[in-house]
């Protein structure tokens, strides 16, 4: 979708590609499970307070505004943020990408009413050293799916030897644009400028 916009389900795209272009191996999903309102349990949070846990030197005790009026108390093991940070929060009842269901719990004798998330916990990257600090802007309580790509469908193709152009994402985008009449956006980067007065001559000859 970075290169071509289409408004049909990915299943229909897969069916059209399978008929006219190449073999479709499968459609898989990545990220937060999108079932039973689960995406609604992931929200933007604003850290109002953050300090050392009274019973654990390596934990932070945070008060996080998630748009409910009163902040939620959340215990976190990361230290790469502080008061004023905008963060990704999972509320009790949320199911994480790895299948874990988050529950309200006590950590070292203190209630934790949610979870502040890292990139890896959201399957957005491999960074697990700290939590995923968001850019300022989204209000507390904003659905996280409006800010981050929490759930994505992945189309896996088997490209045949006669279509090497489909080995790149842009080649797939060009094919989808042709099949569904979408506008193909330019590739990123600038085209090199020709220098000199002479234009290159290209000829194709049958052997």
Predicted feature locations:
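Phosphate-backbone binding interfaces of nucleic-acid-interacting proteins
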Residues: 1-207
């Amino acid at each position: 979708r970075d290169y071509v916009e289409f408004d049909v389900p990915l299943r229909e795209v897969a069916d059209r590609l399978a008929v006219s272009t190449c073999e479709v191996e499968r459609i898989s999903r990545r990220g937060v499970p999108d079932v039973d309102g689960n995406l609604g349990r992931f929200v933007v949070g604003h850290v109002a307070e953050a300090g050392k846990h009274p019973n654990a030197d390596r934990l932070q005790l945070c008060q996080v505004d998630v748009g409910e009026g009163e902040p939620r108390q959340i215990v976190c093991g990361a230290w790469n943020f502080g008061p004023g940070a905008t963060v990704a929060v999972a509320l009790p009842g949320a199911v994480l990408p790895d299948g874990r269901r988050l529950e309200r719990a006590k950590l070292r004798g203190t209630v934790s009413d949610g979870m502040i998330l890292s990139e890896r916990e959201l399957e957005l990257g491999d960074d697990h050293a700290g939590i995923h600090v968001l850019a300022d802007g989204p209000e507390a309580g904003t659905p996280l799916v409006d800010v981050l790509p929490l759930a994505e469908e992945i189309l896996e193709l088997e490209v045949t030897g006669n279509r090497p152009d489909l080995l790149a994402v842009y080649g797939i985008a060009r094919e989808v644009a042709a099949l569904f009449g979408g506008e193909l956006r330019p590739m990123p980067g600038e085209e090199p400028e020709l220098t000199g007065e002479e234009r290159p001559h290209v000829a194709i000859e049958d052997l």
